């Protein structure tokens, strides 16, 4: 926490409160001074609004406590420009049962972080960056963390619903790795169960030798119709499911082919999204262990049997956790609980995170309670990271005209097409000589960045509208605006004739440079906040505000001097600031999975 500015400011505030109370002979009046904290100031870095409450809690005159508190804060070199502001507020209060208006006076303490402290911290950070060290120094013990995300179903194309899990999950992994943790990305694909008996039966009956992922989708739809309408096909499907579970060579061969075609399709999308190191460990991996788990829980009398089903119940949830159906088949519940046990006892994870939509909250609550009930949890942490739906631009569920879920590949292709049209128009306006391959490459990068940022920029628990025109806009809080901000930094630095000018101290020369550098130092706060909440949108807020501060910096701080398009001079200090900001922007780009573009 040593680089987290708000944490440091509040620590110093708490120390000042303790000393103030000691000096006013009010020792131990307040057990938890940490309940008092700064908030963001309107025209200053921070303000303390609870001096009246503090005075009332201690039965002291508020002016006396404010004066003493200011004295203590002034003795700390972390702060400067400390002052008090008295505010009058009209408030309705009850006196003898009657409402009456009264004027309440509040005293607010405002202050800034000192220029000396900012200068020291900025230059320490800049030297760390130039030496190749990490911009973030972890303060936590390294943990083994498993993040379960994406998890599409085999034999089906990835759809728009998989987008959020994949993008949010990957960003969380990158942030946790930056914090020094050992992160294992797990893709818990749906690759087992009755649906594969249906597929295998249909493929055998129709002697289908080859198929694409789209054709597999159609095979699944047709087999589902037959399963629901034909008793004979339903029985055949169940027999094929048993045959698959028993390791029949022909059944396994067909299953492996379906699996391979599906995974190849998934990897094409993962490659576009920049998703690497995602280990596929689906339901089939735990198949043998499911039987062992259910038998063990049965013999230990941990299971309730109702209508030949094996169930478990937890407090507060009436819906049963189904471990075995009446026909002996296993369920989604069974595979998830088996996977959890494997991750705890075999893979020995310290922290397991499930990035799955919010509709599954009850399921994970049940499973976590069962794990505690079975005494599986010691010091490990289990966490469900839920998220809202992807909606159309009109606020309705994103569907095709026929009412089907939109394929993720179609979404990506559509955004790439729009980005390509915009890119071609800009190239035409600027008379640039780009070939079709260059246009497609840059358009793909823009499209993927826009898809990711449009998702991550929204609080994950909220539904968000998928609006192509809005996400590709070059103005406002969009990926295109951010990419332009980074490209401008790179363009300025490319024109510097001698990179050695980037070495040296950074000097805070004016208000815009101070505001920009203060924002740079808040990167620790935003990373800590992201880890604490598992909400990557805080990184997006920080990034947008940082580039906004950089834009203001340019208005009063010239970096390069030109005479008739000839470079005649430069400001080394301003170039160092731009270089530092560029590196911070690049790191945040990396954490949210955006790809950098040299020229935009």
Curated annotation (Swiss-Prot):
Query: Per its UniProt entry, what is the enzyme's top EC class, as one word?
Result: ligase
This entry's Gene Ontology molecular function terms read: arginine-tRNA ligase activity; ATP binding
Write out the similarity annotation. Answer: Belongs to the class-I aminoacyl-tRNA synthetase family.
Which InterPro entries does this UniProt record tie to the protein? aa-tRNA-synth_I_CS, Arg-tRNA-ligase, ArgRS_core, DALR_anticod-bd, Rossmann-like_a/b/a_fold, tRNAsynth_Ia_anticodon-bd
For this protein, what is the EC number?
Answer: 6.1.1.19
Q: Which Gene3D superfamilies does the protein's record reference?
A: HUPs (3.40.50.620), Isoleucyl-tRNA Synthetase, Domain 1 (1.10.730.10)
Q: Where does L-arginine bind?
A: 151-153, 162, 332, 336, 360
UniProt keyword list:
Aminoacyl-tRNA synthetase, ATP-binding, Ligase, Nucleotide-binding, Protein biosynthesis
Keyword Cytoplasm (UniProt): no
Q: Where is this motif: 'HIGH' region?
A: 152-162
- SUPFAM superfamilies cross-referenced by the UniProt entry: Anticodon-binding domain of a subclass of class I aminoacyl-tRNA synthetases, Nucleotidylyl transferase
Specify the protein name. Answer: Arginine--tRNA ligase
